[in-house]
From Swiss-Prot:
Cysteine disulfide partners in this protein: none
Classification via CDD domains: DEXHc_UvrB, SF2_C_UvrB
Transmembrane feature ranges: none
Lineage, uppermost ranks: Bacteria, Pseudomonadati, Pseudomonadota, Gammaproteobacteria, Alteromonadales
Domain of life: Bacteria
Self-association state and partner proteins as the record states: Forms a heterotetramer with UvrA during the search for lesions. Interacts with UvrC in an incision complex.
Domain Helicase C-terminal as annotated: residue spans: 432-598
Protein name: UvrABC system protein B
Helicase ATP-binding domain sequence ranges: 26-414
One MF annotation (Gene Ontology) recorded for this entry: excinuclease ABC activity
Keyword Cytoplasm in annotation: yes
Native source species: Idiomarina loihiensis (strain ATCC BAA-735 / DSM 15497 / L2-TR)
Annotated UVR domain residues: 637-672
Amino acid sequence: MAKKFELVSKYKPAGDQPKAIESLLDNLDAGLAHQVLLGVTGSGKTFTMANVIERSQRPTLILAHNKTLAAQLYGEMKEYFPNNAVEYFVSYYDYYQPEAYVPTTDTFIEKDASINDHIEQMRLSATKALMERRDVVLVASVSAIYGLGDPESYMKMMLHLRRGDIIDQRDVLRRLAQLQYKRNDAAFERGTYRVRGDVIDIFPAESEEIAVRLELFDSEVDRISFFEPLTGQITEKDVARATIYPKTHYVTPREVLVKAIEKIKDELKDRRDILLKQNKLIEEQRINQRTQFDIEMMLELGYCSGIENYSRYLSGRAPGEPPPTLMDYLPDNALLIIDESHVTVSQIGAMYKGDRSRKENLVEYGFRLPSALDNRPLKFDEFEAIAPQTLYVSATPGKYELERSGNEVVEQVVRPTGLIDPQIEVRPVATQVDDLMSEIRLRTEVGERVLATTLTKKMSEDLADYLDEHGIKVRYLHSDIDTVERMEIIRDLRLGKFDVLVGINLLREGLDMPEVSLVAILDADKEGFLRSDRSLIQTIGRAARNVNGRAILYADRITGSMQRAMDETDRRREKQIAYNKEHGITPQGLNKDITDVMDLGQGSAKARKSKAEKALAEVASGYDARTVVVKDAKAVMKEIDAKEKEMYKAAQNLEFEQAGKLRDEVAELREQLKRAV
């Protein structure tokens, strides 16, 4: 019997939530394809979403526009559904340099990437959950619209093991190799297996804590057990069956691979003829050499570097057809929730064009076959065509969502806690930094936190350095900081390890920090997408979860965007005040548990934390007591920054010996920094 969604919470729907939940469910039952939930900050939109999921009992994909928000939603959904499958699917690259060709300098840049092992495991776990069960909440970023292995091929490649099966040990090992598992009898880690006599231990690629032990008696499966890889302790003995999933989504059955290679050879021949007719001899030689090498690798190993560029043939799709994506793994009756839709929808539409322009260069100059253009994100119209029933969630819905839903908007403006939108003040730009510093001191004295947003990365770093020099515990947050570090920084702010977080565009949609009582928006009168009315409303909303919430806009004039943002905030304040008065509610601050949503091990967390704090030019353990050490560390950090800039410049100028020398000097300075700390 299929497991049902079971919402676990000490709270019951209140305020506008009960009415919103009923309206959304009625619309879903009526078959409405698109609807909008307009929910103000702090009104409990996530709780409403969780109630809709439980009441509808439908597998759900939640799309978020960045990894930070996705991680936060994942953590909240895990708390609401502890007995169900809550999964996380975002890009697994900590660093990614796609292959590219620059014709002006005749420079080919090889694909280079650093894969986050933990997130890769979570992606594999997500697709496994979609295939095995119905009670799945999957939180994803726009990675969901990028090409993924074909689900049919993926399912065909699974290795099913049953007690009593007759199977030769060599056949098991051969099948594991086809699934891209590696034999490692010394270090037993994810995606590997080891052999000890008639016992084969397999560490599934999608698993974090459980491995499979297969015991053979001659050619018969005698026993299957689950055990903890670290301790070797058996958790389940004598299991009837076990399924081993492939190590990657890009696995293909041998017969499909052989057919695909024949088609690749045909395309290669046609492409070579075209290039020769155009007298492009270098390009013809290049495409022949590169493609033949890939074909050899696929025949020998079953995969090659960049195998995704042949996904059209591997998935058996026609030219121009949409690639297989995570959306293809969803069950028929799935529900799609697009969180912060005013940003996420436009992001979905932008992915295809950027990818296309880069690949066209690679095709034109003989680095890839034209079929590589079909390894791409979904076009927006393709996404619309395969999207299931959709719920758009935002405090500031965009024009697209309103049009698609036929203005079917469910409002959730009243907060159950009685919290009122922040009061807004406008102050002059001339004294903004000093004024901000005095406001920060007032907040830190009573244990509250502050967010400050600037217009550029350089401004955020300079402001953080200036506040740090004046004894304020501060860090900054921007796009250079990877997914897990961002979540750790936000968690540390809530824990009080520092008091001020400076950012640019990341301190907006969805970030849930009830301890923040002041949002300071510097240069608020500079019109642009960072200071549009929607952006301002979202940023101001970060202080709406605190009973003392206030927002200060530093500006020399009130722009149209500022006025619209202030008018909308006042409208919401008035509605909440009237509701509180009618029901005798006294506003109460949120008391939300602080958890590490990613459930990461201490070792890796510490390593990342150390890296983040170096980038932020501070040492967490010595804000006050070790001032001298901090200054020494800061001096070393400045030297590291200077050397790194020289190193990157040398690499760009193709002076690799000089870059290598500078790299070694940077490594030595980092060792000095460790000793200083």
